[in-house]
Amino acid sequence: LSFYTFSYAEGLSYFSDDPNSCMNCHVMRDQFESWNHSSHKAVATCNDCHTPHHNVVAKYTVKAINGFNHSLHFTLGTFPDPIRIKAMNERVALENCRTCHVDTVSQMHASPGGEQADCVACHGNEGHRTIE
């Protein structure tokens, strides 16, 4: 069953940086299309925002966890609608926002509690805007 699922879901494509691999699963079509029409398309692929940059082990660990979860939900038909980002993936994306936009982030002041601003609180749909 695992081999069939991996093969059917084109599992090897998830090891690439090709955004089209996100289209293997029909539930990601809206996210792909909104990225495809966003300003981020010119500067970032799915992996640039959704996988860690600091080391290759962390990158492929996140890809493996997400690949397993996606293939499981795809096979069982249990994806939530609309699909929601998990806490681990939101932390990865936020860190990548801060890495790519370091000049902007460095000019921001921490909150009185010492926490850095949460980019996705205001820009949560960035890269995945609703297409009208």
Predicted segments, located by residue:
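Short sequence/structural segments immediately N-terminal
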Residues: 1-132
